[in-house]
Amino acid sequence: MVNFFQIALVLIGSTGIINHVIIIPMLLDHSGRDSWISIIILSLVYIIWIPCVFIVHKYTREEHLFSWLMRNYGGFITYPLLSIIVLYLIILGTVTLKETLTFFSFYLPETPRILLGVLLSIICFYNIQRGVQSIALTTGILLPVVFLLGFFVMIANFPHKDYSLLKPIMEHGMDPVIKGMIYPAAGFVELIFILFLQHHIGSKIKLSQLIIVGIILAGITLGPTIAAIVEFGPFVAANQRYPTFEEWRLVSIGKYIEHLDFLSVYQWLVGVFIRISLVIFLIPDVLQVTKQKARNQIISILLICMVIICILPISDASFYWFLSHVFLPISAIGLFLFSMLLLVFVWVSKNKKRA
């Protein structure tokens, strides 16, 4: 068992890699200069949605979510939902690994992608098979350094920031603002993972704690988005594949120390390590596979399949289109609808017991 603080760090580290890095170019593509407004408006909606997650947690009584569904609604409802969640988690892990191999191709262009994929998979496998405690402990050790580096790059780049680039506000009306909201939403709704992990949490979860995690997730999305706009301008930032990490290229210490962007590699690796470990751990966990040998076999097969898919000759443009137009919008809408469905199930179950 782990406590809520540890799980919160895992969720922040996992969701941070998508909201801090992956969604920002797509958000800038659709909302441009007003991307930061999209995040602020969405964050207000997000704070309203978080109590829905808490209500589901409260009335499932810290039981395994899918055990609760099976007990109350049977396999006819539970198995289709479980299948969709498992498929979503597999795609999520594959997308994360694919993005990682693309990012590392900038730094290690001559290194075979399969080698990088296998090395990362081996490290993640070792972490996953040791359980949620291992994932939580490694996150607690690695993530604070990521936060420190984030504050460092923010402070170091103050001389390069021009906040006048945030204006004019809503030059093209509300339409671009609304279009961009779907991308940070894809990361925000991953807070629902707390329900998949609730049977591993030994401490009581409070609504205020979930709201604090939500505010942190909103902050780590808003900060780099504003930074990209004020440092590069909305048009240049939108043309960059990873504007968050391009910010590291601006960092220098005095006259003689620069090219510190290698530190971004640590940030990325930590985020990906946490995210892949969490996502792949959840698959046998939601399937309630208890035997360690069977769990290890499932984890191994999943990681091997992910590496094979990631080294297929798929262009980055096609992959970017898939993320932007298919996966992220479906993820955001799908997880939101899933949370609403759980809320309905909880309400019906509660009224049945009263009757």
From Swiss-Prot:
Keyword Hydrolase: no
Keyword hit for Lipid biosynthesis: no
Entries under PANTHER family matching the protein: SPORE GERMINATION PROTEIN A2 (PTHR34975:SF2)
Membrane topology: Multi-pass membrane protein
Pfam families reported in the protein's UniProt record: Spore_permease
Highest classification ranks of the organism: Bacteria, Bacillati, Bacillota, Bacilli, Bacillales
Name of the protein in question: Spore germination protein XB
Segments passing through the bilayer: 2-24, 34-56, 69-91, 106-128, 135-157, 180-197, 210-232, 265-287, 299-321, 326-348
UniProt keyword list: Amino-acid transport, Cell membrane, Germination, Membrane, Plasmid, Transmembrane, Transmembrane helix, Transport, Virulence
Family note: Belongs to the amino acid-polyamine-organocation (APC) superfamily. Spore germination protein (SGP) (TC 2.A.3.9) family.
Cell compartment(s), UniProt: Cell membrane
Biological function: May allow B.anthracis to germinate within phagocytic cells and therefore involved in virulence.
GO CC terms in record: plasma membrane
Gene Ontology BP terms: amino acid transport; spore germination
